[in-house]
Amino acid sequence: MSEIFDAKAFLKTVTSQPGVYRMYDAGGAVIYVGKAKDLKKRLSSYFRSNLASRKTEALVAQIQHIDVTVTHTETEALLLEHNYIKLYQPRYNVLLRDDKSYPFIFLSGDTHPRLAMHRGAKHAKGEYFGPFPNGYAVRETLALLQKIFPVRQCENSVYRNRSRPCLQYQIGRCLGPCVAGLVGEEEYAQQVEYVRLFLSGKDDQVLTQLIARMEKASQDLAFEEAARIRDQIQAVRRVTEKQFVSNAGDDLDVIGVAFDAGMACVHVLFIRQGKVLGSRSYFPKVPGGTELGEVVETFVGQFYLQGSQMRTLPGEILLDFNLSDKTLLADSLSELAGRRIHVQTKPRGDRARYLKLARTNAATALITKLSQQSTITQRLTALAAVLKLPAIKRMECFDISHTMGEQTVASCVVFDANGPLRAEYRRYNIAGITPGDDYAAMNQVLRRRYGKAIEESKIPDVILIDGGKGQLAQAKAVFAELDVPWDKHHPLLLGVAKGADRKAGLETLFFEPEGEGFSLPPDSPALHVIQHIRDESHDHAIGGHRKKRAKVKNTSTLETIEGVGPKRRQMLLKYMGGLQGLRNASVEEIAKVPGISQGLAEKIFWSLKH
């Protein structure tokens, strides 16, 4: 039995300086991370007789040990707190599940600049515009830009090795700088400048310059050129008319909040140069009994301080909630950015409109999320009743994908009480089996997945095996042989056989490989959740298989050539713009690739020809 935490003795050792504290339970897990301007005062508040909330009572009841880290300043404490939250993911902290870097539009610094989507560190020479809320918003913007300003979007490896213009040139979406004589340097540079101005929010300058060029072309009797520029002007106007724009050229993030039924939605609008680049809804994990103020404060800190390496900070942040540590947050962000960042909670004018828009979006997204959660909860409850289980908190499903036995991939998808847990989806490359042996593939993936220690919270209540009796028999055999520290008898193994003509609604379920199967009515909520997880698993497996097949297709020919290892293969494919470009290259062109000698170039050339 663990010892009772002696709060009085501990508090005697605590300093009154700023710092961060970590609370541990009896199992040694960090259950809460907090910061304080005065550590002694803050930590003493946890051990009073009248605690502020049930959440705090539950937290204090589990404390077995507290670690304290003293910092020089409050700002240091704030940064360290969020680093610890990201590292330990404590269950009593509000957690933001968002580790993705945000995409930007990249305009390269090449002689003939190209447009592309970019994520991650900004090492490449060029200009970055954004951030955008997701990849879809970037791809949509790039497609739009390509229609208005025909600047190239191809990779440099493709650009360097073209002798004839590509389809994009033929349909008027690229000026073809890859082929000499198709476009003048001045004309291409002019289109690049239009892109730069457009992405910087200077639409009026773009229109002014285009109108002047159209009038000049008309005066010079170059009517075809004037008509082309007229079409460009109309396209720019159509785009700018649709945008929600502020005349102030605002550069800010707007954060709206909605909170209901223990769930929070934080909606962020990304506004750059007065244009709404897009928005995104976040649903942080909120422990029971948490106040809205703590949700907002923790979210904002994690959103900017944990993701600071990949996130471009705006000049101003508008908040739908008055933070107690607003000044501290602004100072910390300013220190991080190397410039002044303003945090505002009571805006007026256009900014108030932005905040209202963010608030409305947060409320709408929360209603949708609660509705979806209600549906998945009803379906899981129905399935638990069918399977005679008290509840289903976690469910995993497996599927196998291959083409004629080649490039076999197994997928595992995970659902919890709220639906798909995509961060925990996994793919497994299957090797060392007879091609096309799905039973052996299932046997292998289950051993790899479950033949090791598993956290108690991650032991599934139900394991779905897509494939029916044969696959279920493999699963039963694997689990019978497992020698693991967790309860291998806890998961219920359930086989799912596809119906006649593989139609949805005709699935047969099996508890035992040799037993009789049973079906559920097509309108059964329990069947719907089975179909949902089965389809997720199928799509995840096919996606992995296609990636593996494409990779093999591009590299298998080169793998047979002696002297061409992974690095040289990568260099050849990158420099030549793919396998087809390499097949069409001469010996002299291949020899120009870094690391390829004349002799090796000849070997590669003749190997590809035969």
Curated annotation (Swiss-Prot):
What are the cysteine partners in each disulfide bond?
A: none
SMART domains with a match to the protein in the record: GIYc, HhH1
Q: Which Gene3D superfamilies match?
A: 5' to 3' exonuclease, C-terminal subdomain, GIY-YIG endonuclease, UVR domain, UvrC, RNAse H endonuclease domain
- Supply one GO CC term from the record: excinuclease repair complex
Q: Which InterPro entries does this one have? A: GIY-YIG_endonuc, GIY-YIG_endonuc_sf, GIY-YIG_UvrC_Cho, Hlx-hairpin-Hlx_DNA-bd_motif, RuvA_2-like, UVR_dom, UVR_dom_sf, UvrABC_protein_C
Annotated compartments: Cytoplasm
* Segments forming domain UVR: 204-239
PROSITE patterns reported in the protein's UniProt record: GIY_YIG, UVR, UVRC
| Pfam families reported in the protein's UniProt record | GIY-YIG (PF01541), HHH_5 (PF14520), UVR (PF02151), UvrC_RNaseH (PF22920), UvrC_RNaseH_dom (PF08459)
Q: What is its main location?
A: cytoplasm
Residue ranges of the TM segments: none
Q: Where is the GIY-YIG domain?
A: 16-94
- Keywords, comma-separated and alphabetical: Cytoplasm, DNA damage, DNA excision, DNA repair, Excision nuclease, SOS response
Could you give a GO molecular-function term held by this entry? DNA binding
Cited function:
The UvrABC repair system catalyzes the recognition and processing of DNA lesions. UvrC both incises the 5' and 3' sides of the lesion. The N-terminal half is responsible for the 3' incision and the C-terminal half is responsible for the 5' incision.
Give the UniProt family note: Belongs to the UvrC family.
What does the record note on quaternary structure? Answer: Interacts with UvrB in an incision complex.
| Entry protein name | UvrABC system protein C
Instruction: Read off the lineage from the record.
Output: Bacteria, Pseudomonadati, Pseudomonadota, Gammaproteobacteria, Enterobacterales
